[in-house]
Swiss-Prot record:
Signal peptide (UniProt feature, chain positions): 1-18
Manner of cofactor binding, per the entry note: Binds 2 Zn(2+) ions per subunit.
Main location: secreted
CDD domains, sorted: M28_AAP (cd03879)
Name of protein: Leucine aminopeptidase 1
Length: 389
């Protein structure tokens, strides 16, 4: 995701000189061919602005804090639902309506669960989506999600891997409701070291290990609701953990392209990407807050999220921007689905250690992550029981 540390001129020159670092090919499951990369990739830097670049060109843009979609295999994303937001705009509740049910659930969220999961998740050398470590970390995460459903006795719920040709699968957990109207909660599971992605460590504690474990803990507690557990909620809720966000929103594009083609009725999508770093905010003398992204998002959903934070969180929100294609919510939006994005702080105070070996747990606040878990849980519950017309 997003902004990266500024490189020194000598380091930038070193990395640029290694234009195409040697990368081990990913060996996929039986019956699948080895993934072969193209020589160049078609990226979209803003609506309608495209460019062909090499893989090193992609990483160079990321080192310059420039985000993009890699649309090499997804040029038609959004073409089917091109008029969806105009013709079928979603009306969200005017205010939160389930306070008496949600507040007791919020008390069941546990920081220790997030810490335990994040300690293991960051122990993989990297979660780079084309590495064996990335495939292994995804398999481990799938096991944790499956265990969460099993421990809750969620016999109606399911979890599956959404495979990709590069080896690291995305993950989708589904909590069926009485309709196919669907609310999606997302985070990305991959990490990257932009200096040498295939070689150097990328613990990715904040980006986006923090979001990954935040929504996993929200899922655990959401399943303590009888209405969610027995499938009597009006709407279906899904939790997504996307692969290859760092490569240009690849995993989320693949999922939402499939949803678009299937005619899936996604009413809302919230992305939690980087939920744990607050030190720069505090150092600046500013109050701890939840950063609510206001550009390239659905305004109605974003307004409702602001109300959720005000009612259910212990800290305020601050409005901020992150630019085009800055995280996986952009894929949902491009596919024609209402999406929103929250981050750990005002964007200018977000974590500058991401995409390096220093994106470690020791710099994160689990108290702050708990606020994001409260937001996630409350929003998922409120929208699961909302009456979408």
């Amino acid at each position: 995701m997003k902004s990266s540390v500024l490189l020194s001129l000598c380091t930038a020159a070193l990395v640029a000189g290694a234009a195409h670092p040697l990368e081990p090919q990913v060996v996929l499951k039986d019956g699948q061919s080895t993934f072969t990369e193209p020589d160049e990739y078609l990226i979209e830097l803003s609506p309608g602005e495209t460019r062909w670049v090499t893989e090193e060109g992609k990483w160079e843009l990321r080192r310059q804090n420039i985000n993009f979609f890699d649309i090499t295999h997804h040029e038609d994303l959004g073409t089917i639902n091109a008029n969806r937001l105009i013709e079928k705009s979603v009306k969200f509740p005017s205010k939160p309506a389930f306070n008496k049910t949600v507040v007791p659930l919020l008390k069941k969220l546990k920081k220790d669960n997030m810490r335990k999961h994040l300690e293991t998740f960051t122990s993989f050398h990297t979660r780079y989506y084309k590495s064996q470590y990335g495939a292994q970390s995804s398999a481990w995460l799938l096991e944790q999600v499956s265990k969460t459903l099993s421990d809750a006795g969620a016999v109606n719920a399911s979890v599956k891997a959404f495979p990709h040709p590069w080896g690291q699968s995305s993950i989708i957990a589904t909590l069926p409701g009485k309709s196919n109207k669907t609310v999606v909660i997302g985070a990305h599971q991959d990490s990257i070291n932009l200096f040498l992605p295939s070689i150097l460590a990328a613990p990715g504690a904040d980006d986006d290990g923090s979001g990954t474990v935040t929504i996993l803990e929200a899922l655990r507690v959401l399943l303590k609701s009888e209405g969610i557990l027995d499938g009597s909620a009006p709407n279906t809720v899904e939790f997504h953990w996307y692969s290859a966000e760092e490569g240009g929103l690849l995993g989320s594009q693949a999922i939402f392209q499939s949803y678009e083609k299937e005619g899936r009725d996604v009413k809302a999508m919230l992305q939690q990407d980087m939920t744990g770093y607050v030190q720069k905010t505090l150092d600046a003398g500013e109050p701890e807050s939840v950063g609510v992204i206001t550009d390239f998002v659905d305004p109605g959903l974003t307004e409702f999220i602001k109300q959720i934070i005000t009612v259910y969180c212990d800290i305020p929100f601050i409005l901020t921007k992150c630019g085009y294609a800055c995280s996986d919510h952009a894929s949902a939006s491009k596919a024609g689905y209402p999406s929103a994005f929250v981050i750990e702080s005002d964007f200018k105070y977000s974590d500058s250690k991401i995409h390096t070996t220093e994106d470690k747990i020791e710099y994160l606040s689990f108290d702050h992550m708990l606020q994001h878990a409260k937001l996630t849980l409350a929003l998922a519950y409120e929208l699961a029981f909302a009456e979408f017309k």
